Amino acid sequence: MAAVFPVNNSSDRPKPAVLSSDRRIVGATIAVLAKLLSGFTVRWMNCAPDTCQRVYFANHTSHLDAVGLWSALPRELRVLTRPVAAKDYWGKTAWRRYLASSFNAMLIDRHDIKVHQSPVDMMLREIGDIYSLIVFPEGGRNSDGEMGEFKSGLYYLAKKRPDLELIPVYMDNLNRVLPRGEVLPVPLLSCITMGSPIYLEKGESKADFLKRARETVRKLKDS
């Protein structure tokens, strides 16, 4: 089960939109079930829960990742955090769309990206001065547990909003809780580790930044 951490309320930004009562109940139920089924522990390494705007970026191995990471956050942060999720999966049926809306997911179409409809610009427009994000820079899932190369989206988020704290996250064993191709999760123990925030450094190239960001996630695996 996730540990309880005090939350720093370091921001006085506007309040988030209030979800309907049924979606709030479903969202709370999802969080409880995710904790029970994955049995995850949460570690904050040189980092503490905070209501400031952040981008949590993590390795990606399972459809459960977005829900798992969102559920691992304290309740005060969940209402301020929007997971970015694949529209081709979470938008496939009315039931999945409803579930996604209950944890305020932002659905991105990975296969129909247009120049004038940048996913990064959409994310920044949707979060405004209110929400944090959960993203998976690899773009797709890697079921073998090995991290792929990071896509450029994280770099452009950091470049366009340098005020956002970029929090590396390593999710261990969630790919075995909901293996690729499976519908029902398998109860197992897993661990979610949050690391120290990083920022885009002055003069840092896209390639160097993405390599450094990926390495910060990888190091959490061994911490």
Segments from the language model and where they lie:
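Soluble, non-transmembrane catalytic domains of enzymes that act on hydrophobic metabolites at membranes
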Residues: M1-S10
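Helix-to-loop junction immediately C-terminal to a conserved catalytic motif
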Residues: D22-R23, T29-H60
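Catalytic core of membrane glycerolipid acyltransferases/transacylases, capturing the structured
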Residues: A48-D112
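Residue-level preference for the first positions of well-ordered beta-strands
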Residues: Q53-V55, I130-F136, E165-I167
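Helix-adjacent hinge/juxtasegments
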Residues: N104-D129
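Catalytic-site beta-strand/loop segments enriched in glycine and acidic/polar residues
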Residues: E126-Y155
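A cross-family acyltransferase "interaction/gating" segment
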Residues: D144-A207
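A conserved mid-domain beta-alpha-beta active-site/ligand-binding segment of alpha/beta enzyme cores
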Residues: G195-P197, R212-K221
